[in-house]
A protein has these predicted regions:
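Flexible "cap/lid" subdomain of the alpha/beta-hydrolase fold that forms the substrate-access gate
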Residues: 11-13, 52-54, 61-94, 98-260, ...
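Short, flexible hinge/linker loops that cap or flank conserved catalytic cores
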Residues: 7-9, 19-21, 26, 222-224
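N-terminal cap/lid segment of alpha/beta-hydrolase-fold proteins
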Residues: 1-12
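A short, glycine- and basic residue-enriched loop/turn
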Residues: 35-36, 101, 264-265
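Catalytic histidine-centered segment of alpha/beta-hydrolase-like enzymes
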Residues: 264-273, 277
Length: 286
């Protein structure tokens, strides 16, 4: 894996890349509280089969500039800008958690840029809005989002003791906790060990919550046209398994395939990397 810097949609992105420069492009988008490093098992696997795999730190994370806005329309435009910056017409876009929400939005708003879509443990934005209004269970699972609306305090709590709460969140949100070795967790703790390093990541939640309350939702248009794969770790503490219902998903992506991964939780690409790689590469090879 090689570090890479890109300018897209008006800001500088830090990224990791692997694979031949002329290979088909796969763009991998991480979630919270993660970094491009969360794709460390997928980047070499994709490269070994001839893909050019690129995983950026999202806007406001890690080595990427922390500059708003952080609304879904802007974040989807980041994806289109990265595809352009890499000199391509389109890409396979893979996303987990917040990266998956952004990938869904990009597949709606920048249809020409997303030739195939892969989403891991991330609800469709419309489905999440509906569940948050209708489901006591999902509101309970998402109670951390409400806590994140408090100014200043979440940044301080998450960053104190050298990001110890970040480590607890990664382990606590996983079904297979042993993948988070102390050495691995140190990479994430150091990325979020000061309050200012969390300003951008928490702005995703604050902007999304405010826009939902004010009903300023982005207009996504019709269903996703790109072939879509949804991989879902079934022991997800934060998201209802109903989000992985194939019949439900066909409302948003008619050409969808759903694969449920029973022995994994929310951080599925870290908890079950071999299974994720197997399913991803099989589907891409169709």
């Amino acid at each position: 894996m090689t570090p890479l810097e890109l300018r897209a949609n008006g800001i500088r992105f830090a990224a990791l890349t692997d694979g031949p420069d002329d290979g088909p492009l796969v763009l991998l988008l991480h979630g919270f509280p993660e970094l491009s490093r969360s794709w460390r098992s997928q980047l070499p696997a994709l490269a070994a089969t001839g893909y050019r795999a690129v995983a950026p730190d999202l806007r406001g994370y890690g080595g990427t500039e922390s500059r708003g806005p952080y609304d879904l329309k802007t974040l989807a435009a980041d994806v289109a800008g990265l595809v352009d910056a890499l000199g391509r017409e389109s890409a396979v876009v893979v996303g987990h958690d917040w990266g998956g929400v952004i990938a869904w939005a990009a597949a709606h708003l920048h249809r020409d840029k997303v030739e195939r879509l892969v989403v891991m443990n991330a609800p469709h934005p419309r489905a999440m809005n509906k569940e948050m209004r209708a489901s006591d269970e999902q509101r309970k699972r998402s109670r951390y989002i409400f806590r994140f609306q408090i100014p200043v305090l979440p940044e301080r709590l998450l960053s104190r003791d050298r990001g110890a709460q970040i480590a607890r969140s990664l382990r606590g949100g996983s079904h297979v906790r042993e993948v988070w070795t102390p050495e691995e967790l140190d990479h994430y703790r150091s990325a979020f060990d000061e309050p200012h390093k969390l300003k951008g990541p928490l702005a995703y939640y604050r902007t999304g919550f405010r826009n939902a309350v004010l009903r300023r939702r982005v207009r996504l248009g019709g269903p996703v046209e790109a072939p879509t794969l949804v991989l879902w770790g079934m022991h997800d503490r934060f998201l209802s398994p109903s989000f992985a219902d194939e019949e439900h998903l066909r409302r948003y992506a008619p050409n969808v395939t759903v694969v449920r991964i029973e022995r994994a939780g929310h951080f599925v690409q870290n908890e079950a990397p071999e299974r994720v790689n197997e399913e991803l590469l099989r589907w891409l090879g169709r």
